[in-house]
Curated annotation (Swiss-Prot):
It is found in: Cell membrane. It catalyses: heme b + (2E,6E)-farnesyl diphosphate + H2O = Fe(II)-heme o + diphosphate. HAMAP family: CyoE_CtaB. This is Protoheme IX farnesyltransferase.
Length: 313
């Protein structure tokens, strides 16, 4: 890892505030992760995740706070490792680590503290399995994705994206103390959804990735293969998302919601593919709708699952 050049560092008189440390945790990214965690808790409990209102509320607070700290810790270490390339990308140049506002040492102390507190909270007030699932997600994101795959292969998102699949397992394990087939489906849905979401983003900022040498799919194999892969993974996502209905884990509320949400995901993926197949470049304006909708798709799909299992349990 290279250090930040002196010319890009902030004046020594400028001190980091709590907002700068909050920015290290990537709060905007974490919001969707926490949503899948919380909705998974309702799915696992088939309703309110507690024997009483207060016990359920306490568990929701513990898992949400601990989940934020664990995911935030992963974001901190991601910024430490990637500070050299973050400085060269417009989207990330202002991050506290790449700008020199927060040193790598202080960031590492902050990130480690968050992770330790998260693990202890989940172990004591959740379940040991929830604590281990949270730690596994952290290790996968920081070590497997950021440290190993991100700079070496265009499969980085396919494999490394599994880190984002752990939050629903954390929520499920916090409620039940174990994992079952339906929890595995939640993991798999996010696994196949991730390339759709992040390759749409990669199309939008591919030139920045190219400049810093990150082998994202559109950089390595071009727009046409990227949109084809997006379409393929969109199909996988929609088909897999509807399979729990067949096994009786959910019923018509989830099925209708999943089918409608999935149909629009497939349509936007097809529109993007058709645009590129016609010989036009995958410009930002044609990738943005899919990128934004993919987040809404996942959020509403998990909400539908929580409502279905609560109402029709």
């Amino acid at each position: 890892m290279t250090s930040t050049p002196l010319s890009n560092s902030l004046p020594p008189t400028q001190h980091a505030t709590w907002r700068d440390y909050l920015a290290l945790t990537k709060p905007k990214v974490i919001s969707l992760l926490l949503w899948t965690t919380v909705t998974a808790m309702f799915m696992a409990a088939r309703g309110w995740p507690g024997d009483t209102f207060w016990s359920g509320l306490w568990l929701l607070i513990v898992v949400s706070v601990a989940g934020y700290m664990s995911a935030g810790s992963a974001g901190v270490f991601n910024m430490i490792i990637d500070r050299d390339i973050d400085l060269k990308m417009t989207r990330t140049a202002g991050r506290p680590t790449s700008s020199g506002l927060i040193s790598s040492r202080n960031a590492a102390i902050f990130g480690t503290t968050l992770q330790v507190l998260s693990f202890v909270m989940l172990w004591v007030w959740g379940t040991p399995l929830a604590a281990w699932m949270s730690l596994a997600g952290f290790v996968f994101y920081v070590v497997i994705y950021t440290q190993w795959l991100k700079r070496t292969t265009w499969h980085n998102i396919v494999i490394g994206g599994a880190a984002g699949c752990f939050p629903p397992l954390v929520g499920w394990a916090a409620v039940t103390g174990d994992l079952n087939l339906f929890a595995g489906y939640l993991f798999a849905i996010i696994f196949f959804w991730t390339p759709v979401h992040f390759w749409a983003l990669a199309l939008m900022i591919k030139e920045e990735y190219r400049e810093v040498g990150i082998p994202m799919l559109p950089v390595v194999h071009g727009d046409h293969m990227t949109v084809a892969q997006i379409g393929l993974y969109a199909i996988y996502t929609v088909v897999l998302s509807l399979m729990p209905v067949y096994f009786g884990a959910v019923s018509w509320i989830y099925f209708v919601s999943g089918a409608l949400l999935g149909a629009w995901l497939l349509w936007l993926s097809y529109k993007l593919y058709r645009h590129v197949a016609s010989g036009q470049p995958a410009e930002r304006k044609v990738a943005v709708p899919l990128y934004l909708y993919s987040m809404l798709y996942l959020a509403l799909l998990f909400l539908a699952g929580a409502i279905d299992r609560a109402v029709l349990s």
